């Protein structure tokens, strides 16, 4: 049996993913480090920026705000989040993040367990906000092993 080896991944090594809002960097993943139980990343949001509403049908999401002030909508209810606070988002709970502060916000996120396939792990429920540096993309949900929730865009 092969033994996994530790690997350090620098945030600068990871291409930004801006298609759902914010600058999402998935650092520690099955692809980057051979993770088998989940993945971890960093969300960077400019003032006024948001990450569009979505949910995870197979994973809990753990977040920790490193800097800045955020609001998170959890199944339609809004909660404040600030630096040095953490939050656990249960499986199937819709959520959206907004930077409501005057400075950049940084939030570490971890999802576990992994979905059976990457395409099943994230379900968009609204279109992303379009900014100057991101183009609109079609919201197409791939094949799913679980029923969609009402209101899911497809």
Swiss-Prot record:
Keywords on record: Antibiotic biosynthesis
Domain Cupin type-2: 42-108
Presence of the UniProt keyword Heme in the record: no
SUPFAM superfamilies: RmlC-like cupins (SSF51182)
One Pfam family in the UniProt entry: Cupin_2
Basic and acidic residues bias (residue ranges): 143-154
Keyword match Transport: no
GO term, biological process aspect, one: antibiotic biosynthetic process
Cited CDD domains: cupin_TcmJ-like
Pathway recorded for this protein: Antibiotic biosynthesis; curamycin biosynthesis
Region (Disordered): 133-154
Family: Belongs to the SchB/CurC family.
Protein's name according to its UniProt entry: Polyketide synthase CurC
Organism whose genome encodes this protein: Streptomyces cyaneus
Taxonomy of the source species: Bacteria, Bacillati, Actinomycetota, Actinomycetes, Kitasatosporales
